[in-house]
Amino acid sequence: MPMSKLFPPLLVAILVSGCAGMTSPTPPSPPAPTTPAQRTAAAEALAVERQWLGSWFRDTPVKVAQRGDGAMSIEVPREFSFDPGKSSVKPALAAVLDKVAESLRRAPQAQVPLLAAPDDAAVITPLATQRADKMREHLRSRGVAEARLGRPAPAASASVQLRLIAAPLPLP
């Protein structure tokens, strides 16, 4: 067989095999809302997400509420979040975090500056910080960009706490 007939299929095979291991680049985060109209649109998008999450968790122990500063708060009781003495995320909390990740995909201006988890005694300890870190890891594994997440923190209450904001604020 002449070389000219082998070349096109060989070239296609090389190109396809080279592309097989490539991953698509992560799209950049949208710019922060800077005008009052953009901030209003971001706040309205967060309100829509609060209603959507509220409908998902209606009649469950999960509390979804709007705070006075316009942020959304989500609280999940500790007993549904972590086993005593463990930092692994339980399935109920994983389901909440999955919905939060979906909500963050739908509201690209939203951020989660607070991810707080309690210790078994509702005190601040390394276990509480480890739990908050596991929550952060879970959200990252669901495609939430690290830049949209605040540092993990211990919670001073008996519930897991998440706070979502509409416009980027300085993360702690």
Annotate the PLM regions.
Residues 15-18:
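C-terminal motif of bacterial Sec signal peptides marking the signal peptidase cleavage site
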Residues 117-172:
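Periplasmic OmpA-like peptidoglycan-binding domain that tethers envelope proteins to the cell wall
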Residues 38-47, 57, 67-98:
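Short, solvent-exposed beta-strand/turn patches at coil↔beta or beta↔helix junctions
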Residues 1-9:
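Bacterial N-terminal signal peptides that target proteins for export
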